[in-house]
Amino acid sequence: MGLSTYVGTFLLCILTLSHCKSGKEEYGTVIGIDLGTTYSCVGVFKNGRVEIIANDQGNRITPSYVAFSGDGERLIGDAAKNQLTSNPKNTLFDAKRLIGRDYDDKDVQGDIKRYPFKVINKNNKPYMKVQVGSEEKGFAPEEVSAMVLSKMKEIAEAYLGTEVTHAVVTVPAYFNDAQRQATKDAGAIAGLTVLRIINEPTAAAIAYGLDKKDTEKNILVFDLGGGTFDVSLLTIDNGVFEVVATSGDTHLGGEDFDQRLIDYFVKLYKKKEGKDITKDDRAVQKLRREVEKAKRTLSTEHSTMIEIDNLFEGKDFSEPLTRARFEELNNDLFRSTLKPVMKVMEDSGLKKEDIDDIVLVGGSTRIPKIQQLVKEFFNVKEPSRGINPDEAVAYGAAVQAGVISGVEDTGDIVLLDVCPLTMGIETVGGVMTKLIPRNTVIPTKKSQIFSTAADNQPTVTIQVFEGERPMTKDNHFLGKFDLTGIPPAPRGLPQIEVTFEIDVNGILRVSAEDKGTGKKSNIVINKETNRLTPEEIERMIQDAEKFSDQDKQVKERVEVRNDLESLAYSIKNQVKDKEKMGGKLSDDEIKTIEDAADEAIKWMENNPQAETSDYKKQKANLESVVQPIVSKLYEGAAPPTESTPKEEL
């Protein structure tokens, strides 16, 4: 771990603690919200402990559903979900699966096919369309999430007896920047200032580790909810919760298991009755409601009955479902949850026996087969049973809210999260120059000096990428900006300081400064930026492993070419400088060196696709001409360079 990381960690500790002193007066009571795909939960740190707050129906978790009745009345939570089967086209859910994504996203297109409500394309963003009274209205996923957040705000205010304006909201660890920004926007729409976005497995680790602050432990959090899946590996040591590695899938959860059951029963009905019930939205939603109940029953029973009155065209439906059949239908999905577990183990460098505790979070971890797979992976190690999987994330968010608002008994907790992907910029030859490696603790800030690639270059373009491959063409483009007004100077002379800064919410800001003139420019990678889908993240990581040898060869070739080019131009500049080397050589010697450098430059222009060995040979040829001449001046030493070499933009 480098010096800059230690400094970042230390500063975070100070900022967290000093923040506490003034937070209470500024924010009032800060609540913690777990904004889930299928259910949401709210908590508050009060009287020295976390209170998970029940809604007006007495339930501690609230469905993430919004509906509009025939007369335009808006229903949120239990009331909305309860009328799903009678009003399917005007009942909205799954906003979390759409938020921050493009309309043409593969997962979005797959989800649209099973929704009873319409999803329309508005500027390549998915909008959820319903009938509100006499008019049709399209809602952005942020708006629907905002309605759910406003319900959680209302639940907290009813319990506290005071207005709530600030919150900590959780998101899946693998949410990208666009999804995080969109979640913050949803909070603002709901009248909440989202002080912090924290990762769900990290929040769960806080819930687990709050009473274990004095011991050092390695914790693996396995968070499988209704629509998303995360795995994070953390260390807990003296109140410091540090994420070591994270992985996951923002499109895997209990709803996918339900869909497998729905597909199975639809086929079964068609086989027996010769009719397709998918043409009737009400029938499908009735079936969805019953398979969800059956799935829950099968967590404790080995068999159950799916019984639905008047399912389709006046006919009742009754079919058995066993736990074995449920597991068979979802076998591939269940087993796919182990891939991110393997990934975080690999990234952390820890062995299975190094894991002190496994924390299961999210309602889907109640499925016995999931528990069995995790247990077997860790050599029959029993997962921790100390926390409620439905409430753990909101619990941790409430603790973090307490830290921010200055509540006593939380001041010694420090939360250190990580960025899930490497961030960097493109340098000469299309090389991905990494500034912030994957799994770096955030918040973090990293700067590096670069220079120009051509003489008298007035502008440099900073192109920002994320990904694990050595070449930018294989990574994901985030954005770009120009730094202009660079005074005329030989290539390699200007000093351009590029700074990457990731804040506590995982949001990236990139700036560039010409150290000579002080001129600056920057970009914030925000919700308008086309950030990665989780599938692209997983593909990049897999590709990085698959093509690692090929990548090394390509990178070596570009580096050797850059070395040759830098040497040729550096030598030319030095022999022109009469104050230095140029003043100590004869005209014939200067011409010999310049001709050799020009020949190397011309060869590179004529051979852009040359192999690594060819570049090395050309460099050796150039050195064989230059070395004997300058060795007389420097007693056999290599020619001096003007300064420490800098990568070129």
Curated annotation (Swiss-Prot):
Span list, region Substrate-binding (SBD): 399-499
Keyword Cytoplasm: no
Residues binding ATP, per UniProt: 36-39, 96, 226-228, 292-299, 363-366
Annotated segments matching region Nucleotide-binding (NBD): 125-279
Main location: endoplasmic reticulum
ATP-binding recorded as keyword: yes
Gene Ontology MF terms in the entry: ATP binding; ATP hydrolysis activity; ATP-dependent protein folding chaperone
Regulation: The chaperone activity is regulated by ATP-induced allosteric coupling of the nucleotide-binding (NBD) and substrate-binding (SBD) domains. In the ADP-bound and nucleotide-free (apo) states, the two domains have little interaction. In contrast, in the ATP-bound state the two domains are tightly coupled, which results in drastically accelerated kinetics in both binding and release of polypeptide substrates. J domain-containing co-chaperones stimulate the ATPase activity and are required for efficient substrate recognition.
Record-linked Pfam families: HSP70
PROSITE patterns: ER_TARGET, HSP70_1, HSP70_2, HSP70_3
Residues annotated as signal peptide: 1-20
Keywords: ATP-binding, Chaperone, Endoplasmic reticulum, Hydrolase, Nucleotide-binding, Signal
GO cellular component terms given for this protein: endoplasmic reticulum lumen
Short sequence motif Prevents secretion from ER: positions: 646-649
Function: Endoplasmic reticulum chaperone that plays a key role in protein folding and quality control in the endoplasmic reticulum lumen. Involved in the correct folding of proteins and degradation of misfolded proteins. Acts as a key repressor of the unfolded protein response (UPR).
Family: Belongs to the heat shock protein 70 family.
Name by which UniProt lists this protein: Endoplasmic reticulum chaperone BiP
Organism: Echinococcus multilocularis
Lineage, top ranks: Eukaryota, Metazoa, Spiralia, Lophotrochozoa, Platyhelminthes
Gene behind this protein: GRP78
